[in-house]
Amino acid sequence: MTRLAPGENPPQFVIFSFDGAGWHDRWTEFREAAAQVNARFTGFLTGIYLLTDEHRDAYTGPGHSPGKASVNFGGDAATVTTLVGDLNAAWMEGHEIGTHYNGHFCADNPPGGASWSTADWNSELDQFFGFWNGWQEIDGLQGTPPLAIPASEVKGGRTPCLEGNWDQIAPAWAAHGLTYDSSIPGSGIAWPKQEYGVWEFRMQTTSSPALGSVMAMDYNFWYKFNKAKNQPERAPEIHAAVLETYRHMYEAAFIGNRAPVLVANHFNQWSGNAFNPAAKEFMLETCGKPETICATYQDVIAWMNLQDPAVLAELQARPAVY
């Protein structure tokens, strides 16, 4: 990392992130791709993926009954131990693990994050870190290899469905040592700023040549394309539209304000596996380009903290690009 001189252009950061981060095949696929182009990326772990189905009652979502969630739990013991191995391997390779919280409770399964209080968010994060530190005891798997990543390495995350009352969640971030978030919807592609006591990497919007004005996340691309209908036969069309959108975002930022580009995804196989291959193709073609660094959120924060405050302020004052 280097400190910019006044007037010097920053590198073009690209931050790949994956919500959920609980699928072995996808961990393997993206770790292998990243290794080819010296990329680092972030996985936002759903905490209940560390609980076997048998021990799902260890989780109580705020306002919900024990053992209930809007997503699956971790499966059997072999699946959970495989996930822990994936997390350990990814972290050792320089990738980052953050939080996607736990039960994925949103407006469609209330009460969701948009209505939770600070106490609710504290409970959600207390449980996330409780699973992180205690999954072996909860699941009865004390003889298996531990999760080797210190809980203190989890510094940020993304809320399910991008929901939250930010005044309510901010004290919970502070109480759990979180230093960044990437949940609040933004406008365009812009430099992160300090908001609510953390670095806020606002979710980006772009004027996609293929999709029009859209929030830059895989599910939002899908919804804009066909209202998120499962049409596997159209996977090549979706893939092309998503890849064109990523390329447009990169070029807009590279020749514009050089703000970090957020490639926000889930590990998924939606609509005939249209989305993850587009993200991987973009990673492979972009991360080796000159003046380009594919990094984690913590990497970019460390770089920003290294800069002269006046230089960083000039970057943050640059208008958003679309």
Language model region names:
Residues 121-147:
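Short N-terminal edge-element motif at the start of the domain
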Residues 2-3, 177-193, 244-322:
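C-terminal domain-boundary segment and adjacent tail
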Residues 108-127:
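Active-site cleft segment of glycoside hydrolase catalytic domains centered on the general acid/base Glu
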Residues 1-96, 103-107, 138-164, 169-170, ...:
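Active-site beta->alpha N-cap acidic-glycine motif
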Residues 55, 211-215, 273-276, 306:
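Short conserved micro-motifs at the rims of enzyme active sites and ligand-binding pockets
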Residues 59-78, 144-257, 308-315:
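Active-site-adjacent pocket scaffolds in enzyme catalytic domains
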Residues 26, 30, 82-86, 90, ...:
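Alpha-helical packing segments of well-folded alpha/beta enzyme cores
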Residues 17, 26, 99, 120-122, ...:
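Glycan-processing catalytic domains of CAZymes
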